Amino acid sequence: MTDFDLMNFPFHERLDSPVSENGEIKDGEPIPQNWLNENHVGKSILPLFVNPEDVINCNFSNARDSYEENKSPSMDQMNYARNTSYQESPGLQERPKNEKDKSPIGTDVHKKDVPNFIHSTPRENSSKHFTRANEQASAQPTDEHTSPDISIEDCNGAKIFLQNSLSKEDFRMLENVILGYQKKVIELGRDNLRQEERANSLQKELEAATKSNDKTLDNKKKIEEQTVLIENLTKDLSLNKEMLEKANDTIQTKHTALLSLTDSLRKAELFEIPIGILFFDLYDSEENSSKLDHILQEKYPNIKGFLCASQQEELSRISQRFKNAKAEAEDLRNELENKKIEIQTMREKNNTLIGTNKTLSKQNKILCDKFDKLTIDEKEILKGCNEEIKIKLERLNERLGSWEKSKEKYETSLKDKEKMLADAEKKTNTLSKELDNLRSRFGNLEGNTSERITIKNILQSRPDISAEECNFLMVEQIDSANLTTLQNTVKEIVLAVGIPYPKLRRKIPLLAIKLKYENIMLSNFAQRLHRQVYSQEMNLKKFTDQAYYDFMSTRRMDSIDHHLERCLDHLYDHILEKMVK
């Protein structure tokens, strides 16, 4: 057996022994020819090194001696004694008396030399009878004068000591197990007789096999590396799948929220104008500008602007935040696609490794069938391969540590991505709140559109006003004026006429009557009277310009020195003087 075979031992499987768990031999079932080679190697190797004749002749206890004296040798024992020459195995040896008082430290040091496949492999099912006997022996009180301890030698010559204070039932159970193995050894002896005739041909095959042994060792190394790599890749793949599913769910929710945000923003209107589409036109444009002025002026030439400058700056900031959020979402989507591509490549590598592993396992099976027949050379190869196996296991442990470090790096990177997603979610929430606030402010600024005064309403409510007069007065241009201009105009009117704002709409007709009728009639009367008295007209335009100049220089209505007042005073004094005379 080579180190290549040991690396492929099915240590985790249970030994399919013809001896049942209760110690009875299954005589009804035939023992296969290659039972030892196929099922026993690597699973429970300890009974191979137990000589049943030593166990029968060993003095375990007084009860055992009396039992052996009255018991006749069985057919299996006689067959085993006849075929002992074909089976080489170390037997049970009595522990020397001078080793009884040795400290347990020496025993522990001695056990360290035992190969790893004896001490560390899980063979709970196959060695159940030995462990059960040891547990019952440890529970019973010991006596100083009991029979000496028993030691078992492994393939390297190292001794493994067993407890000897066992009961009669435990020894019967042990005997049944040993007899079962005797039966297997007898069958193997018969096979060895048949195989002896083919020794010459097998010797030639052995020479060819030794030449290809180096290639087999290389293949074995590749299989070891690939199996460990496949296991690590499958674990990493499962973890990456779970993390990617979580990331996909979070990104999907963020994407749906972003789509709903873009849809609501696309449907946004201002003064019956689809202003939301303008944001997307600006985003799709090649110019690196964050202002909607040129796009708005191209589509709606009559519109000069919306709201004040501060609110426009606020809207531009909101659009910039929206662009940043969209860019971050696109980056996350691209990163997710890259992760999917990496997982696909890893999956393809895994499939290729599985295929190579299958082919190598087939080759391994063919070589194992040849090497199983060469039991003598197996022991020599086994001794030289123990150190190599230890070195390889250390290398595999180092690789496992590196894979764990890379796994931790992936986990930290995924946590960072989750934090970025949480920050993006917070940003989208703040943007949605700001958008709702802007919508509410837009609604308050727009007011009730059903009460808006249009040219149609003017023509219906004022028959004295025509459409040409409305065009001359540029009434429609008022609808395109911004809020600040309209507010300033109304304030100037209120301050100029001295009427409170709540009474302004009600007293506007009175102002119109005074301006269009009463003031004109009074000015005509004064002009006619002045012409009659002085034979010339008053220069009212000059008086008005002088009063306007005084107001603009002082910005005070009470400080205007209107020349019309002096002119009318002189006219009144002159008429009064004429009337008195």
UniProtKB/Swiss-Prot annotation:
Domain of life assignment: Eukaryota
Subcellular location: Cytoplasm, Cytoskeleton, Microtubule organizing center, Spindle pole body
Biased composition (Basic and acidic residues): 94-114
A GO term for molecular function: structural constituent of cytoskeleton
Modification after translation, per record: Phosphorylated in its N-terminal part.
GO terms under cellular component: central plaque of spindle pole body; cytoplasm; outer plaque of mitotic spindle pole body; outer plaque of spindle pole body; spindle pole body
Modified residues (Phosphoserine): 17, 20, 72, 85, 89, 151
Stretches assigned to coiled coil: 179-252, 306-363, 373-451
The protein's role, per its UniProt record: Involved in the pathway that organizes the shaping and sizing of the prospore membrane (PSM) during sporulation. Required for the proper formation of the spindle pole body (SPB) outer plaque. May connect the outer plaque to the central plaque embedded in the nuclear envelope.
Domain comment in the entry: The length of the coiled coil are required to adjust the space between outer plaque and the central plaque.
Subunit composition and interactions: Interacts directly with ADY3 and YOR129C. Interacts with ADY4. Probable component of a SPB complex composed of ADY3, SSP1, DON1, MPC54, SPO21/MPC70, NUD1 and CNM67.
Name the UniProt record assigns to this protein: Chaotic nuclear migration protein 67
Source species: Saccharomyces cerevisiae (strain ATCC 204508 / S288c) (Baker's yeast)
